[in-house]
């Protein structure tokens, strides 16, 4: 770190769906940050959970914004806009901000010591595109960060940037050193990623299990996600032979069920 004083952090995240992931994330951060994280600014994208969110650990602000219609028209959500507005309108008194997905959380008290002045998770498989599951940077640079950059291009161009993919480039242009964090696979390579030397876990698409995104209903199996949630609470991030058997059976049942639904109801059938 360029300063002699120990950095302090405010977490920024957005919530959608049920409270499982956001509650677990904040509980883990509070337990494993050694007091370095002093608050959390949460965007309620469910727009109905403000009271419940205010009762969670570390929460200092719950923000609710009008939907960004242009972004929602692209993929059914306005996550980039929500994070941008949180940085612009939230109250920050700490030296640093940590943006985290609600289904990302530390698993070791060493995670804070692994953070540099600017530390940004990379999208798995990329050497430049950054991911909002974990982004730490000085609060004074929040005006530089734009999670929405080029996001609307996804409506016309396959492979256009998703949420926060340009943040690494934006912060590099400030001239400050930027540490890009590579992932290692979790759950035997089938689900989730570790960052910061295995001290931080990101599940990925966790909120879709309880959310209302029709286009993502077939992206994750709700039955399989129940197993992963159970293992997360047990602090176990690998699968047993019995787990593999159960996941395979659920996968086959889901494929057969969705094919039958498609045959009976046609293109209007939503995958489950």
Protein language model annotation of sequence segments:
Residues 37-48:
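Short beta-strand/loop segment that forms part of the nucleotide-sugar
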Residues 18-22, 46-53:
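Short, charged/polar "capping" segments at the starts of alpha-helices
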Residues 105-173:
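Conserved catalytic core of nucleotide-sugar-dependent glycosyltransferases
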Residues 48-93:
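Active-site-proximal specificity loops/subdomain of glycosyltransferases
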Residues 164-272:
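C-terminal catalytic/acceptor-binding lobe
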Residues 27-37:
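Short, acidic, metal-binding catalytic loop of nucleotide-sugar glycosyltransferases
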Residues 94-105:
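Short beta-strand-to-loop acidic/aromatic patch adjacent to the donor-nucleotide binding site
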Residues 9-18, 32:
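A conserved hydrophobic helix/loop-capping motif in glycosyltransferases and polysaccharide synthases
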């Amino acid at each position: 770190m360029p300063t002699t004083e120990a950095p302090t952090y405010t977490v920024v995240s957005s919530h959608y769906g049920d409270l499982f992931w956001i509650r677990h994330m904040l509980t883990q951060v509070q337990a494993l940050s050694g007091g370095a994280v002093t608050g959390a600014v949460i965007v309620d994208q469910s727009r109905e959970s403000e009271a419940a969110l205010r009762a969670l650990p570390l929460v200092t602000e719950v923000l609710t914004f009008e939907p960004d219609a242009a972004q929602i028209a692209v993929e059914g959500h306005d996550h980039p806009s929500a994070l941008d507005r949180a940085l612009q309108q939230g109250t920050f008194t700490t030296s640093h901000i940590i943006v985290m997905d609600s289904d990302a959380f530390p698993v070791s008290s060493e995670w804070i010591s692994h953070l540099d002045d600017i530390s940004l998770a990379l999208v798995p498989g990329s050497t430049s595109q950054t991911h909002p599951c974990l982004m730490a940077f000085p609060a004074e640079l929040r005006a530089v960060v734009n999670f929405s950059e080029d996001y609307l291009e996804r409506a016309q161009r396959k492979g256009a940037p998703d949420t926060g993919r340009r943040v690494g480039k934006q912060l590099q242009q400030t001239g400050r050193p930027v540490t890009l964090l590579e992932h290692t696979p979790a759950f035997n390579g089938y689900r989730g990623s570790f960052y910061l030397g295995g001290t931080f876990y990101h599940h990925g698409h966790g909120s879709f299990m309880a959310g209302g995104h029709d286009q993502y209903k077939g992206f994750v199996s709700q039955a399989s996600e129940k197993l992963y949630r159970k293992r997360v609470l047990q602090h176990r991030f690998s699968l047993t032979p019995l787990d593999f058997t159960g996941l395979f059976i659920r996968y086959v049942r889901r494929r057969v069920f969705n094919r039958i639904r498609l045959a009976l109801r046609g293109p209007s059938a939503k995958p489950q």
